[in-house]
């Protein structure tokens, strides 16, 4: 007998669909406690009290050389708005006699270590740690980069508690130099795109080895950590499920395929309704960064006239697309919206498109 499923009535209806033959394999991937819809526990990942005290961004964000604290924020905050930044950069509160930061870096939530990179030169992240949080829905990752050192004994598969020390803030990096006076913690919250990332990576022929497996930064899509934390503090949202549900759509597209991407299997909280008995495609809603935050399964009747494995853009917020210059999701060609380069990358990773 299958036990009663957890969560809200809507959540239970969605999870119910995974009991079908189509969904049973994916059901095994559901995180423990994924249906819990209460208020999550999350903390600022450094000792600085500035954000907790409600002080302005200049008191806790590290600028990227411009002197403007906004350049340490999320999104198109650099190079006059055309350079995208996946997370936020948090400045140190204390330094040692050599001027090196001495702040501990904490786990923002309880979770499981998925990746530890102790070699500073192997990534633009420098030394970094990735946690996955299976007790929240969707089961986001958090990432902690540019560390001076990683806490002893921290390895993939280790369970960590909220506020557990992961390492020491630093300015490690690969391929470029972060000056000591701009040392910081690069902090991300987001979703992992595909378990088939290596196939996508190999097809791109980057000319370098993937040293980080699934937790390569190219396989990770972040949300704005500061925006989430501020909405959570103000009690506008209690958890990530509520936060994703109120995201602003930038692009809505339809993809005709009988395939269920592993992204959906891992993040069933993003399903808008249960799967039909015979899946014919997906309607996918993306925010301005291209993150696919809402998935609606389609029946054959809903896909009439559309071509298999060819994305069809059915709605584009043209104003938002023009405003956000660090991402290109949609391009007008011959009077028709088509996927831009950043949306193409998302679809390639999700569906194995070439």
Locate each region found by the language model.
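Bacterial N-terminal signal peptides that target proteins for export
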Residues: 10-22
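Hydrophobic h-region of N-terminal signal peptides that target proteins for export
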Residues: 26-35
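Surface-exposed, glycine-biased beta-strand/turn segments
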Residues: 36-127, 211-354
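Short helix/strand-bridging catalytic loops that position acidic/His residues to coordinate divalent metals
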Residues: 91-94, 142-151, 171-176, 206-212
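Non-catalytic surface loops within mature trypsin-like serine protease
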Residues: 92-94, 135, 149, 187, ...
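Zn2+-dependent peptidoglycan hydrolase active-site motif and core
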Residues: 100-102, 108-151, 180, 184
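Short, well-ordered loop/turn sites that connect or cap secondary structure elements
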Residues: 108, 154-160
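Conserved, short, structured surface segments that act as functional micro-motifs
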Residues: 123, 128-131, 158-236
């Amino acid at each position: 007998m299958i036990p009663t499923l957890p969560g809200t009535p809507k959540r239970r209806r969605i999870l119910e669909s995974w009991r079908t033959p189509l969904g049973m394999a994916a059901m095994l991937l559901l995180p423990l406690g994924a249906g819990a819809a209460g208020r999550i526990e999350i903390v600022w990942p450094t000792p600085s009290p500035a954000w907790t005290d409600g002080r302005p961004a200049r008191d806790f964000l590290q600028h990227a050389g411009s002197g403007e604290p906004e350049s340490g924020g999320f999104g198109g905050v650099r190079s006059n708005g055309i350079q995208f930044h996946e997370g936020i950069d948090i400045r140190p509160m204390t330094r040692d006699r050599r001027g090196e930061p001495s702040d501990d870096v904490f786990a923002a939530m309880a979770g499981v270590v998925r990746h530890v990179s102790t070699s500073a030169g192997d990534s633009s992240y420098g030394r970094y740690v990735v946690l996955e949080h299976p007790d929240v829905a969707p089961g986001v990752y958090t990432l902690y980069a540019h560390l001076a050192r990683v806490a002893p004994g921290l390895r993939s598969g280790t369970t960590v508690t909220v506020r557990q020390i992961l390492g020491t803030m630093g300015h490690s990096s690969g391929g470029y130099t972060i000056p000591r006076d701009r040392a910081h913690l690069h902090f991300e919250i987001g979703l992992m795109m595909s378990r088939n990332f290596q196939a996508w990576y190999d097809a791109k022929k980057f000319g370098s080895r993937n040293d980080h497996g699934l937790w390569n930064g190219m396989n990770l899509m972040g949300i704005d950590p500061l925006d989430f934390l501020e909405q959570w503090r103000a009690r506008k949202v209690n958890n990530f499920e509520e936060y994703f549900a109120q995201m602003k759509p930038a692009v809505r597209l339809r993809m005709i395929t009988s395939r269920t991407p592993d992204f959906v299997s891992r993040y069933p909280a993003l399903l808008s309704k249960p799967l039909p008995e015979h899946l014919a495609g997906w309607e996918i809603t993306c925010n301005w960064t291209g993150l696919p935050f809402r998935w609606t399964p389609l029946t054959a009747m809903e896909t009439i006239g559309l071509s298999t494995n060819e994305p069809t853009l059915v709605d584009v917020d043209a104003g938002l697309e023009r405003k956000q210059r660090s991402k290109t999701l949609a391009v007008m060609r011959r009077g028709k919206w088509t996927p831009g380069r950043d949306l193409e990358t998302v679809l390639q990773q999700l569906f194995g498109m070439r």
